[in-house]
Each structure stands twice: as C-alpha cells, then as structure tokens.
Amino acid sequence: MSSSLQDNYIKKESLYGAQNYSPLSVVIEQGEGAYLWDVDGNKYLDMVSAYSAVSHGHSHPELIKTLQSQSTKLAITSRAFYTEPFATFLEKLSNISGFESVLTMNTGAEAVETSIKAARRWGYFSKGIPEDNAEIIVANGNFHGRTTTIVSFSSDSSYKDGFGPFTPGFKTADYCGSCHCGSIENCLSIESLSLIHISEPTRLGMISYAVFCLK
C-alpha cells in the first residue's frame, strides 16, 4: 500500500541506511495496542503487537505513564550508582523466575555472549575443565543473534558466509524438548568432561537465556 510519501521515506532509508534488513514497503507512524497506522493514515493489525520480547502492544498506556514519570526524575545513569527502580526490578524478576540472582543485558545477543562466558568460567573454575578445552552444546537450527561468536554456532550458512574465521568450542545437537532422542546424550558420550549446554527456556517468556550445566 505504498504511496509517493511512503516511497520517499523508503528511498531515503535505502540511500543512507545499511542494507541489512528487508522490511515491508510500509512506513509506520503511529501504534496503539495491536494496531499500526502508516504515514498515509492506513490502519493495520500487527499480529505480533510490537516485537519479540517486547510484544506488550504499542504505546501501552501504563508503560507510557511509567516512562514519562521516570524521565522527569532520572532518564539514564550508569551502574556506577545504585538506583531504587533497578533494585526493585531485580527483586521482582528474581521472584518471578525463581533464580537467585539476575544479570541484565541490553540485547539478546549480549545475553547469549554473557551466557557463553558464564558457562565457560563455570566449567573452568567449578568443574575443573582444562584451560581452553570447554565445549558448549548448541541446538541445530538455532538463532541467537548476529555477533561473530554467535554465528559461529549457527547452522544457517546465510549467517556465516563471508564472516569467518569463527569462534571454536561448540558442538551441535538436534533440539529435543523431552531429551528422549538422545542427541545431547550422544554429545556427552564423546567428551563428557567438557560439555556445557546453553538454551533458551520457553517457560521464562521474556527472560532471555539461561545456562544449564550438565553434570
């Protein structure tokens, strides 16, 4: 439903922006709940109601109210200071998830990269794996982001072509929710001392990544 106005914005983005996405030919201007409006006033039903882990609807009134209230007091600060909202957030997230502590990240890719670091460090310091010998089991067909280390364990060549050399230390297993297929167990039977499993547990919803240490 492209118009001359939308075409102008699309051409401008194509001219000045990196061509790393292939969006629909619609220029969105406003959103409310599950609905979107383009610059020509056409209305759309957004079937995902925003994006990925923030699919709580567009311009949710309670979120807007909270954002406006907080921005009048403190819009941004570094972790060099303690803040009440962050402490309260950590407590609530810990209670909801059932985990003892929380480490927040800006993006999913950051969460995965940090999970890799946590898994390897646990392997070396707690499990006694020899230095530089840790291996992590990843699911075949995974998508965890586009950073160099993350695409290193992707099984999709379109994410890897032209970006090597890749980070070593990963073993791929077919994903099996019940683990009855034996894929992970087969990986463990190869070198059971040095394997750690990273996955994205669906039961946590908006909480990104967790590390599961296989004993």
Language-model features: locations:
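Glycine-rich loop-to-alpha-helix module at the N-terminal edge of alpha/beta enzyme cores
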Residues: 15, 43-129
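Acidic active-site catalytic centers that drive phospho-/nucleotidyl reactions
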Residues: 38, 46, 110-113, 144, ...
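Generic structural signal for well-ordered, non-membrane alpha-helical segments
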Residues: 2, 6, 33, 60, ...
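Active-site-adjacent loop/helix segments that line or gate small-molecule/cofactor pockets in enzymes
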Residues: 1-32, 80
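PLP-dependent aspartate aminotransferase-fold enzymes
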Residues: 91-195
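Active-site and channel-lining beta-strand-loop segments
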Residues: 26-47
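Active-site/binding-pocket entry motifs
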Residues: 73, 178-179, 213
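Single conserved hydrophobic/aromatic residue that forms the stacking wall/gate
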Residues: 196-215
